[in-house]
């Protein structure tokens, strides 16, 4: 069997048709990784650091090639694709220093002489299941910390990003068995979850729940990032023009295909009317690339049609664009009734609803009403209001006077509720996730 990816801007353009690994091939990849892991860990901090440093250099040298491939395979705008390639380089360099970081602590004994140590050790083989929307950065931010602390890894990318994953692994050029890509779909993903020693997953809520259940049954660590319905709050004292710029970028950037994209805009009091006009104007003029496929396009147009039937007003976009690709004009809707899927679900496209709120309390209640919240933004000139909102919002990541998108790679990444499960990704949190703590007690022999 093969797995194929197509250019979202020109669906007739077949990017790759790769042989799938199958269950047996995935199992074999895990076995090779398990055989390579003791040597990779025992090679020491200097060897692992140097390998990740060389990988960063290789990705940097091929950055333009990788960006062009991301444009072609997943429809990412060139500027964003270049930024993603640069981010992958920065992540590799950041984690190249991690092997030298302290891996434990020394503690005092409760009584008498002795030495108490805590040490962190790798789990073994990390199973990495990644989505298509960040085909360079997400595989790197999962693999780099896992490898830095001495795990080996098997990567199962989304079918739509197969070519990016395979080329990325070639460039990293790690020793045999240290990082293996297994092309495929559900079969390969399920086998990897069933055989790896630790699993990191980013993808849909439905699949993520199955991954969580499978890993819980095996008693192995898992982290799952499942996206969410992200809200932006705009207060009456905000710079409306600046807020509209940020919101348009967070709704329409990369066609809204980011876990941190804004899906719900909540305008407080007098901010509603000027924001409605400013944001509709920007989204109408926004240049927006294609969505990932025909099914995604159908889901977006169906959501707009359903909302309008239910009484919503379409303020911008909401239609398929002309041309051969899977283009969708960024949509803004008002008067979407409570309970409509656009107010409860993530649609993973350039579509947002505009909601009024009488005051900050109501705005926060609306933002926190969803069962999954990854990111939120607050737009205000008042520091006290910003800090109060940040303290009360349920989102895992909160940005003040900034888009919900664009979080920093060296900070913990994750949401709340059903948006995430397990320990955070990125930064030092990832190093803890990919290791287990062990306590060592040394007492005098006599």
Locations of regions flagged by a protein language model:
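Short, well-ordered beta-strand elements within core beta-sheets of diverse protein domains
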Residues: 15-21, 36-42, 128, 232-235, ...
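Structural signal for hydrophobic packing residues in well-ordered secondary-structure cores
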Residues: 37, 41, 56-63, 67, ...
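Short, solvent-exposed loop/turn elements at beta->coil junctions and helix N-caps
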Residues: 54, 113-115, 317-323, 403
């Amino acid at each position: 069997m093969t797995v194929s990816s197509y250019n979202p801007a020109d669906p007739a353009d077949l990017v790759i048709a790769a042989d799938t690994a199958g269950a047996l091939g995935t199992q074999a990849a895990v076995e090779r990784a398990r055989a390579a892991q003791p040597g990779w860990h025992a090679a020491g901090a200097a060897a692992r650091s140097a390998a990740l440093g060389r990988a960063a250099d290789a990705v940097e040298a091929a950055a333009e090639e990788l960006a062009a491939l991301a444009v072609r395979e997943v429809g990412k705008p060139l500027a964003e694709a270049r930024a993603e390639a640069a981010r992958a380089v920065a992540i590799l360099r950041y984690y190249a220093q991690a092997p030298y970081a302290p891996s434990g602590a020394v503690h005092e004994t409760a009584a008498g002489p002795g030495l108490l140590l805590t040490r962190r050790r790798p789990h073994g083989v990390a199973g990495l299941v990644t989505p298509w929307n960040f085909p360079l950065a997400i595989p790197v931010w999962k693999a780099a910390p896992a490898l830095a602390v001495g795990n080996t890894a098997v990567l199962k990318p989304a079918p739509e990003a197969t070519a990016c994953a395979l080329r990325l692994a070639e460039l990293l050029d790690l020793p045999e068995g240290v990082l293996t890509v297994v092309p495929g779909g559900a079969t390969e993903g399920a086998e990897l979850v069933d055989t790896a020693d630790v699993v990191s997953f980013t993808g849909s809520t439905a699949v993520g729940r199955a991954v969580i259940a499978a890993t819980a049954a095996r008693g192995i660590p898992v982290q799952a990032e499942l996206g969410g319905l992200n809200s932006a709050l705009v207060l009456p004292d905000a710079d409306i023009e600046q807020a509209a710029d940020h919101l348009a970028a967070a709704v329409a950037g990369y066609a809204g295909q980011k876990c941190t994209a804004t899906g719900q805009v909540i305008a407080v009091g007098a901010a509603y009317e000027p924001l409605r006009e400013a944001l509709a104007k920007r989204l109408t003029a926004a240049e927006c690339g294609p969505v990932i496929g025909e099914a995604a396009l159908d889901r977006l147009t169906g959501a707009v049609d359903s909302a309008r039937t239910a009484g919503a007003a379409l303020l911008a976009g909401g239609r398929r664009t002309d041309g051969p690709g899977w283009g969708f004009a960024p949509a803004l809707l008002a008067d979407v009734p409570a309970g409509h899927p656009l107010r409860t679900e993530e649609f993973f496209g350039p579509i947002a609803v505009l909601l009024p709120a009488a005051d900050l309390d109501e705005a926060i209640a609306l933002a926190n009403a969803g069962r999954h919240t990854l990111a939120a933004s607050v737009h205000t000139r008042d520091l006290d209001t910003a800090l109060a909102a940040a303290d009360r919002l349920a989102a895992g990541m909160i940005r003040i006077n900034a888009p919900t998108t664009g979080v920093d790679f060296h900070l913990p990444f994750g949401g709340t509720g059903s948006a995430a499960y397990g320990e955070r990704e990125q930064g030092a949190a990832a190093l803890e996730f990919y290791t287990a703590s062990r306590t060592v007690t040394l007492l005098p022999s006599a």
